[in-house]
Structure formats: C-alpha cells, structure tokens
C-alpha cells in the first residue's frame, strides 16, 4: 500500500511539473522577446540640374530606407508592404523596396521639372504684363520675378525604434525645402504587428475615454520638459492651444511606455523642435485594454 501511495504522489508531481512546463512554454511562445526579423538598408542620393546645366537650379533628394529583409517566422512581404506604404505612400505599396525607393526619387525629380516648366511659362506671361508697368510698380507688385527658379531639397529616412514582443515601432523623418528660407521637418510614427504588418492603433490598446484621460499627462510632461510652471509660460515659449491638446495617433510603443510626437505647427511654433511626450505604462494601467499588447508589456515592468 505504501509503495502504491509513493508512486501515486510521484505521478502527481510529474504531472504538475509537466503542466507547469507546458504553461511556461505556451507563454514564452506567444509572447517571445525577439521578433527574429532581419533588416537591410537602401541609400540613394540624386541631384538633378535643370537642363543638365550645373550653373542652374537643381533638386536634391536623399533616401535612407530601412526595411524588413528576411525572417524564418513571419511574413516578410506583408512587413515590407507596410514599411513601403508608410514611408513613401500608398502608390508604392505593391512595389518591392528597391522599386519603391527608385520610383519615389524619380517622381520627385519629375515633379521638380514640371514645377520649373510651369514657372517658366508663367514668367513669360508676367514679363509681358510687366512691360506695361513702371519699374516702381513692378517692384511694389506681386509680379516681381526671380531671375531663376528655386532649388528643391528633400531627405526621407526611417529608423527602427523597437523590435520585440511581436511589435515593430518605427519612425519616418521627412525634411523638405522648396525654395523658402526654412526647411520643414515632420515625424510620422508607426506601430505594426510583426507577424503580419497590420497597424496597431490607439483603439487597439486603450479603453474608451483614453484621450481625455491622457490630456493632463501630456500637458504635465510638456511643462516638465520645457521647465515651465504654467500653460501661459509654455505659450511664451512658442506653444499654442495647449489646453486643447489631445493624443494625435502619432505614437510609438516600446517595452516601457508610449511615446507621442507632436509635429511643428500642431501645438508649437516652427522654431521649436517637435515635442515628444513619453508616458510610462505604469501610469496608465487603468486605461489599457485587457490582453492588448500594451497591457502585456506593462506587466513586464
């Protein structure tokens, strides 16, 4: 009888250990750390002078494109389409990375040539009109002409911010100048499911009403970043509409929290850098949907 009891206890212990091992294995597989996605980079720099004359205005376009190139576990084609679409636009999403980069560069040069040709045509009309005006009238009117067309500049690149736990967060930075004194820089943030390239949205990770709940946290973060004590002081630094600021869907996720980027012109003047607001998961647990990716990441802390 004692032998039977010992064997029974032994079997129960083995069963319990097997059950625990199975549970641990399941948890590890469904929420593994590494995505096992490899990335490659395409770099293209092209300069085009009007009429092939190096003394004339030109366009200069640079692309640095980081994209998923290989994986034994996920659908790389879906990931590539997502990266191409979000970096260059929906028009290019069915093209492979090399085709998309070359197509984007060639389209930029073509657009520049068309703009230059349109300017040349309008300049002829304006010159004919100006022939009827005095020099003073020309100088004071909107018909004053530049001797030559403008030069255009554009740089576009993307960077991987987070690549773990079934998520890829990446940021696209685009800078352009079309003849003005100031270059315009924008940041576009994307979070995608690493298994299929499907976007992760705010509605996927937050409970309803999250936007108003996050408002105060965003304002508090801006006050701390810029050393201001009041919203009025933020406005003195170049911010506006801060009391109405809300989450803008332009976010990144990592293993610590959510990062919002507010581009110049959204709530701040163009002379300021684009504000970035980091909100730790630990401060927004009640706002996170149960079993969402953000909720799971929060409990890794």
Stretches with model-predicted labels:
Residues 5-14:
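Sec-dependent signal peptide recognition
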Residues 23-301:
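Compositionally biased intrinsically disordered regions enriched in Thr/Gly
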Residues 18-21:
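C-terminal motif of bacterial Sec signal peptides marking the signal peptidase cleavage site
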